[in-house]
C-alpha cells in the first residue's frame, strides 16, 4: 500500500512545542534560536498551555527551548502539561541529565526524552567528535534515561554531506532496546535566509534564498531505500507553493537482534479513524507493550502490510521503532517558503502558530 497520509489539519493537529526558555549550554552547527537568554515563568507557561489546548486538539506536547533543562522549574512545567491530560516529551542535549533530575521528571509525568547529540556540536562531554564517540555518547545517554523508567529517543540533524551519520543513527536505534524513537531533522540554511516576513496563514518569505545544500525528502527516501530497503509508513504533505512531503514516517519492528521495516496497512488506516472518534483527538506519541507490538505486527501483515514482519513473531519480545524524517522550510527562487502543512512542531505566540524553526526569525 501507499504511505498513510496523516490527517493532521487545523485544530486536529495533535502535537505542538512548548517553548519555555532561551539560552543553551552547548553550541550546534545548525541552531535556529535567535532570541536572547530568558525563561518563561510558571504562570506564563500555564497561560501558554491554556491557549494551546484551546487552539488544537492536542495529544502530546514536546517541551523545548533553548535548552529546557536550564529552566529551574522544569519538573513543575512537566506536571503542568500533564494536568491538561497530555503526553509529554522533552527535547534536550542531555548535558544536565542525571539521576535526581530524571527521577523528578519521571515523578512529574514525563513520557519521552529526545536526546539531541550530534557531531556538529561543541559540548564538554564530547571532546572527540568521531562517529564512534558520538554513537557511544548517544547510547550512554539513552541508557541513563532508560534506567530511570523513561522512554528514550534521538534527535539528529541530517546533513547532505554527512549521510553516514543518518545511517549510523538509524542502526543504533534499531539495535538497542533502550531507544524507541528517532527524529531526523533535515538541515536547512536558516542563517542564509536572513529575516523572514509574513505569516504561516498568509505566506512566508525569506530575505535571501540561502544555500543549495538543503537536506530534502528525496535524499532521506533514497538513503532509507538504499541502506535499509525501507519504504515510508506515513507522510505529511507540505503547505505552500512547492508540493513535497514535509514529513516521512518509518516504522520498524525489532527483536532478537533483527529488524524489519513495515509498511502501512488497512489496520493503521482504520486505527487512525477509530482512535480519533473514540478519543476526540489523533494519537501522536505511541506507547505500547511488547504484547501490543506483537498483535500489531501480525495484523499489519495480514491486512496488507509487509509480510516480512511475521518472522519476528516467534523471536520473543518485540519493540516498535518510530522514525520521522523532517524537511525544513524550503524557499523558491523568490524566497517564498513552503513549510509543513499546519506545522506539528509549532509554538503558539501572539495568538497564532509559528514553526519552531522559524519563529525567532520572523519579523512581526
Show which residues each predicted segment covers:
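Radical SAM enzyme [4Fe-4S]-AdoMet core and its adjacent flexible, acidic
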Residues: 131-135, 146-315
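A short local loop/turn or secondary-structure capping micro-motif enriched for an aromatic residue
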Residues: 37-40, 267-271, 362-364
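A short, compositionally biased domain-edge/stem linker segment
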Residues: 1-7
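Flexible mid-to-C-terminal extensions adjoining Fe-S/redox cofactors in radical SAM and related proteins
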Residues: 276-364
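Canonical Radical SAM [4Fe-4S] cluster-binding loop centered on the CxxxCxxC motif
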Residues: 7-44, 55
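Radical SAM/AdoMet-radical enzyme domain recognition
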Residues: 46-63, 71-187
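Conserved, mostly hydrophobic/aromatic
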Residues: 24, 28, 90, 351
